[in-house]
Design a protein with these regions (language model features):
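A domain-level signal for the structural core that forms small-molecule/cofactor-binding pockets
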Residues: 2-75
């Protein structure tokens, strides 16, 4: 029974985007393990509070991730 746990910084993805993540990861697992495992393929999306995620020794905020996605340097 596949269990996929995705951690994201809160406020970066919309509810629709999170649903798409769940659908796409389920499809990826089914493609690998077979259709019979679809009913028992679990995908959990956990959101981590802004600033509670560290990269290179520094906290990363929702604003930082959105800036990165827009192509701006963070630092």
């Amino acid at each position: 029974m596949p269990f996929v746990n995705v951690k994201l910084i809160e406020g970066v993805f919309t509810p629709d985007q999170k649903q798409q993540i769940i659908r796409d990861l389920t499809e990826a697992m089914v493609a690998i393990e077979g259709e019979n495992l679809r009913p028992v393929t679990w995908v959990v999306v956990e959101e981590v509070h802004s600033g509670h995620w560290g990269v290179a020794g520094n906290p990363l905020s929702t604003a930082d991730v959105k800036a990165l996605a827009a192509g701006a340097p963070v630092g």
